[in-house]
């Protein structure tokens, strides 16, 4: 049993990038789909697909197509994804305390009472929340 499914997803993406894989599959959930949608919208992944068929029969699979840049598509669009708020130590910030990831070159993904969004969207709406991860 996985105690932190978001950390598992982040670890799988980081490992797939290091291994230069084209895609990675993770067990699906609503929050993982929302995280994938934000990564796609921000240009860090090419696409994602939810596959309902699974050998176990009860949970679908989320297939994330990773994005590579450069002349020969060798440089990954994601340098690193870092988990911030963990089940044992939650990290909450107000809108004034919200960090700039890599001096504005990365994004922070956080969950607010209005849903999951990036740090720039939360600043525009003047919302704080729990920081899920940093992406750069």
Curated annotation (Swiss-Prot):
GO molecular function: rRNA binding; structural constituent of ribosome
Entries under Pfam families matching the protein: Ribosomal_S8
GO terms under biological process: translation
Keywords assigned by UniProt, alphabetized: Ribonucleoprotein, Ribosomal protein, RNA-binding, rRNA-binding
Top-level taxon: Bacteria
PROSITE patterns membership: RIBOSOMAL_S8
Subunit structure: Part of the 30S ribosomal subunit. Contacts proteins S5 and S12.
Family classification: Belongs to the universal ribosomal protein uS8 family.
Entry protein name: Small ribosomal subunit protein uS8
Gene label: rpsH
């Amino acid at each position: 049993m996985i105690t932190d499914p978001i950390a598992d997803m982040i670890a799988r993406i980081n490992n797939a990038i290091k291994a230069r894989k084209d895609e990675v599959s993770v067990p699906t959930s609503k929050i993982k789909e929302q995280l994938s949608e934000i990564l796609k919208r921000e240009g860090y992944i090419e696409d994602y697909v939810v596959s309902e068929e699974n050998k176990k029969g009860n949970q679908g699979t989320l297939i994330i197509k990773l994005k590579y840049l450069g002349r020969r598509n060798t440089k990954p669009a994601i340098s690193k994804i870092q988990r911030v708020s963990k089940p044992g130590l939650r990290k909450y910030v107000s809108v004034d305390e919200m960090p700039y990831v890599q001096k504005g070159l990365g994004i922070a993904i956080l969950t607010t009472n209005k849903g999951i969004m990036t740090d720039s969207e939360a600043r525009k709406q003047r919302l704080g929340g729990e920081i899920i991860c940093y992406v750069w």
